UniProtKB/Swiss-Prot annotation:
GO molecular function: ATP binding; metal ion binding
Disordered: annotated span: 326-350
Residue spans of biased composition, Basic and acidic residues class: 340-350
Native species: Mus musculus
Tissue expression pattern: Expressed in the cerebellum, eye and brain cortex (at protein level). Expressed in highly differentiated tissues, such as brain, eyes and ovary. Not detectable in proliferating tissues, such as the colon, spleen and placenta.
UniProt keyword annotations, A-Z: ATP-binding, Cell cycle, Cell division, Cytoplasm, Differentiation, Magnesium, Metal-binding, Nucleotide-binding, Nucleus
Function (record text): Inactive serine/threonine-protein kinase that plays a role in cell cycle progression and neuronal differentiation.
Active site, renumbered: D150 (proton acceptor)
Entry's free-text remark on domains: The protein kinase domain is predicted to be catalytically inactive; has lost the main activatory autophosphorylation site and the conserved key residues involved in phospho-substrate. The C-terminal region (containing the POLO box domain) is sufficient for inducing cell cycle arrest.
Name of protein: Inactive serine/threonine-protein kinase PLK5
Upregulation: Down-regulated in proliferating cells or in serum-stimulated cells or growth factors. Up-regulated in asynchronous cells, or upon serum deprivation or following stress inducible DNA damage treatment.
Keyword set includes Cell division: yes
Effect on the protein of changing W417A: Induces cell cycle arrest
Length: 595
């Protein structure tokens, strides 16, 4: 038998310079960047163009390698025909006496497994981003009647632009006429579907099960099925039995449960997967910063400049019926990132004054406060003001073992919101009964509870106020979105019995300037200077209102007084506040300083 050390040396004997006999290209082999059970991967440079690739090297030769040789030939036959932005590109292949070489796309950010090794867990916006790319690539594979059979984080690669690519098609196979592959047990045990464990064969739905395992893994840091011994884990897989991650959002837990349905027929299709509330209710970044490979990104949502509201305007103006009343799917608000309202439907619900149809006449034309409509200084100024308020509170007093004596003062805050910023905008409801939407193009529209007035302010523009009798046709699309959000949030507040105590009515020009969020909290900045810090896990709200010595910190907690408990600066200086409040304020400050 060949000594182990000698076998190890023979596996490493890959020449520094390699020539493709078919094309005549000469490559220089670089450092080792990855290895698997039967292959190794190196950085590769084309000597004539300096283009950089990844080189997958599979040893050949020996009677025991016949089966492996067949797998390599199948991998080349399948992979070389694939062309998709979310699948690692296959450029060329050649062989010599000792090895088979595959020249592949080079992904400089390594794999998702490398990211997880450093990060341990990912935020839900990141998971949405990665899953969208994976679903796109996997849909293309399935359209080619190919099942991957080994989907896992180490087989998802990231290029320099943080685009995710499906790679390593060593176990991929074409499905037969019945939609299944041969009944073999292959793949990584933690990610195998019940039908695979039961040796009923892989299908496209087996890959979808693997997506559920991947989603669970990147959100929690551990696979859903990781018990020892192997027989126990396989039984848990057959039963679909796993520890439910209660710290995740309800929509994330729901989608994981759908993906990990033991019956393949109950798992969603790839098209239906992207329509799930997990995607429609929360923010999905268009791209991720490179530093997210080693540290959590902070997502800031300042009003974008210069964007037009084309798509939403066309959709609602041409396709939607009269918008009220509405029905909706789920609640949205503190502790969640917002749920998607249903399309506009007629129903038998109580008609709300905010939803009444009618003609709208222009009431007033005015200019908003100085600085609110400024081009670039507005957000920076508001961030500075908000940061100063948080510092005032943090510096006010010592730590306390219990809450200081407070009083109940009605303050203006947002008890409910709907984050649909990817398509329409960010909708919110105020405690005085008013509501507003910060649209993607930076404009703002609000419904005021006094007389049902509508105020509209385009990005860097003047403030317009209307009555509910007439509206210019260019604004009907935005008004439809606003009224949908308003009715949706008001209905959810009534159903949950969490209608806040009425606050002093806000001025007509109050608007949401910006919101900043990460996986744990959200900070909302309003044009009247109010700063709201919302904690997603505890559903606690910290509202900072007033200026300088008149600053008021109001604490809104589930089960607490409907109007909240407010503390003046003098009270905070003399009594201090608890460690939890201090932590929440610090987190809000961190979000503001990260923009």
């Amino acid at each position: 038998m060949e000594p182990r050390s000698r076998r190890r040396r023979s596996r490493q004997l890959v020449a520094t310079f390699l020539r493709d006999p078919g094309s005549g290209r000469v490559y220089r082999r670089g450092k080792l960047i990855g290895k698997g059970a039967f292959s190794r991967c190196y950085k590769l440079t084309d000597m004539s163009t300096s283009a950089v690739f990844a080189l997958k090297v599979v040893p050949r030769g020996g009677a025991g390698r016949l089966r492996l040789r067949g797998k390599v030939e199948r991998e080349i036959a399948l992979h070389s025909r694939l062309r998709h932005r979310n699948i690692v590109a296959f450029h060329a292949h050649f062989a010599d006496r000792d090895h088979v070489y595959m020249v592949l796309e080079y992904c400089s950010r390594q794999s998702l497994a490398h990211v997880l090794k450093v990060r341990r867990t990912l935020t839900e916006p990141e998971v949405r981003y990665y899953l969208r790319g994976l679903v796109s690539g996997l849909r293309y594979l399935h359209q080619q009647r190919i099942v991957h059979r080994d989907l896992k984080p180490s087989n998802f690669f990231l290029n320099k632009n943080m685009e995710v690519k499906i790679g390593d098609l060593g176990l991929a196979a074409r499905v037969g006429p019945a939609g299944r592959c041969h009944r073999v047990l292959c793949g990584t045990p933690n990610f195998q579907a019940p039908e695979v464990v039961s040796r009923n064969g892989h299908s496209c739905k087996s890959d979808i099960w693997a997506l559920g395992c991947i989603m669970y893994t990147v959100l929690t840091g551990t696979p859903p099925f990781a018990a020892a011994p192997l027989s126990e884990m396989y039984q848990n897989i057959r039963d679909g039995h796993y520890l439910e991650p209660t710290h995740l959002s309800p929509s994330a837990r729901s989608l994981i449960a759908r993906l990990l349905a033991p019956d393949p027929a109950e798992r969603p299709s790839l098209d239906h997967l992207l329509q799930d509330d997990f995607f429609s209710q929360g923010f999905t970044p268009e791209r991720l910063p490179p530093h997210s490979c080693h540290s959590p990104p902070v997502f800031a949502f300042p009003p974008p400049l210069g964007r037009l509201f084309r798509k939403v305007g066309q959709l609602l103006l041409t396709q939607c019926r009269p918008p009220c009343p509405f029905t909706s799917k789920e609640a949205s608000g503190p502790g969640e990132e917002g749920t998607e309202p249903d399309h506009m439907e007629a129903g038998n619900e109580e008609r709300d004054p905010l939803c009444t149809e009618g003609r709208i006449h222009l009431l007033t034309l005015g200019t908003p406060r100085t600085g609110l409509a400024g081009p670039k200084g507005s957000l920076a100024l508001q961030l500075e003001v908000a940061t100063r308020k948080l510092f005032l509170c943090l510096d006010a007093g010592p730590m306390a073992g219990q809450d200081p004596p407070g009083e109940q003062r009605p303050v203006l805050w947002a008890p409910k919101w709907v984050d649909y910023s990817l398509k329409y905008g960010f909708g919110y409801q105020l405690s005085d009964g008013g509501s507003g939407v910060l649209f993607r193009d930076g404009s703002h529209m609000a419904l005021r509870p006094q007389g049902g007035h509508v105020s509209y302010q385009p990005d860097q523009g003047t403030l317009w106020t209307f009555t509910l009798r007439d509206v210019p046709s260019p604004l009907r699309a935005k008004l439809a979105v606003l009224r949908l959000f308003a009715c949706y949030m008001q209905r959810r507040l009534r159903e949950e019995g969490t209608v806040p105590m009425p606050a002093t009515p806000a001025s007509p020009d109050i608007s949401l300037l910006s919101f900043i969020a990460d996986s744990q909290a959200m900070v909302m900045l309003f044009s009247n200077g109010t700063v709201q810090v919302s904690l997603k896990t505890s559903q606690t709200q910290l509202v900072l209102s007033g200026e300088d010595e008149d600053l008021l910190l109001t604490l809104q907690e589930p089960g607490g007084p409907a109007v909240g408990v407010s503390y003046t600066l003098d009270v905070l200086r003399s009594h201090g506040f608890t460690l939890a409040v201090h932590h929440h304020l610090r987190h809000g400050l961190h979000l503001l300083q990260s923009v």
